[in-house]
Amino acid sequence: MVREQYTTTTEGTHIQRPENQCVYKIGIYGWRKRCLYLFVLLLLIILLVNFALTIWILKVMWFSPTGMGHLRVTKDGLRLEGESEFLFPLYAKEIHSRVDSSLLLQSTQNVTVNARNSEGEVTGRLKVGPKMVEVQSQQFQINSKDGKPLFTVDEKEVVVGTDKLRVTGPEGALFEHSVETPLVRADPFQDLRLESPTRSLSMDAPKGVHIKAHAGKIEALSQMDIIFQSSDGMLVLDAETVCLPKLVQGTQGPAGSSQRLYEICVCPDGKLYLSVAGVGTTCHEHSHICL
């Protein structure tokens, strides 16, 4: 409030003019002043609350000059100590654990690792789920510590690079198509069975098929015929004793039967040949085949 007072007198007279007072009011008064104070007080309260929340967040998140919590920012990248949980996809060029500990990736549902090209398309995927492990790629390969391929799979073939492939299941191995291998053998003192329940079983090799049993016997069982056929060579039974225990015994036929009979003859080197049967042996007459 400004108050101005003007008093004038005239020389030689004692008459005093009436006092002239002018009052000017400058400022905010009334409800406006109260609202202004209330607004300023509200701003101070909000400022204090924000400052307290900032201090609380810094304390809870363990912010420090080197990082946040277990997350440390180094010149080589980011370093996490302890267990970490990612709620959204993680994009990284390289992930490795400490020298003295292993790397563990764990999820309640599945763990998926994707490889993308420059256009963002998935070119390779590894998915570990609760019931299966799925690999989606053009080629899947497992190498040894020295870089040697141990197991390779693509659309055309499966290659096992180890010296030995061992199947320990009670039902063995089931192959729907052909198998190419230089050697098939069982474990020591175990039986080797090659079986085709509903179809035929064929073994082919350009330089021969060798079947050996060093400490046991070899059995070939068939409900129908067993045929041994050699187109250019011979069938050799190299044994001290050859037994045919279940040959059918012949019966006496009518006299003068025109049925032709043969006898089996043996050369000194073990070769067998047939000779027309007669009243006596005729092997000597046809022995020129042994020459």
UniProtKB/Swiss-Prot annotation:
Transmembrane intervals: 38-58
Gene Ontology biological-process annotations: cardiac muscle tissue development; heart contraction
Keyword presence, Cell membrane: yes
Pfam family, one: Sarcoglycan_1
Keyword Manganese belongs to the record: no
Membrane-topology descriptor: Single-pass type II membrane protein
Compartments, record wording: Cell membrane, Sarcolemma; Cytoplasm, Cytoskeleton
Domain of life, per lineage: Eukaryota
Segments on the Extracellular face: 59-291
InterPro entries assigned: Sarcoglycan, Sarcoglycan_gamma/delta/zeta
Glycosylation sites per record: 110
GO CC field: cytoplasm; cytoskeleton; sarcoglycan complex; sarcolemma
PTM comment, free text: Disulfide bonds are present.
Keywords annotated in UniProt: Cell membrane, Cytoplasm, Cytoskeleton, Disulfide bond, Glycoprotein, Membrane, Signal-anchor, Transmembrane, Transmembrane helix
Intrachain S-S bonds: 265-290, 267-283
Subunit relationships: Interacts with the syntrophin SNTA1. Cross-link to form 2 major subcomplexes: one consisting of SGCB, SGCD and SGCG and the other consisting of SGCB and SGCD. The association between SGCB and SGCG is particularly strong while SGCA is loosely associated with the other sarcoglycans. Interacts with FLNC.
Family: Belongs to the sarcoglycan beta/delta/gamma/zeta family.
Described purpose of this protein according to its UniProt entry: Component of the sarcoglycan complex, a subcomplex of the dystrophin-glycoprotein complex which forms a link between the F-actin cytoskeleton and the extracellular matrix.
Protein name: Gamma-sarcoglycan
Native species: Canis lupus familiaris
Gene symbol of the encoding locus: SGCG
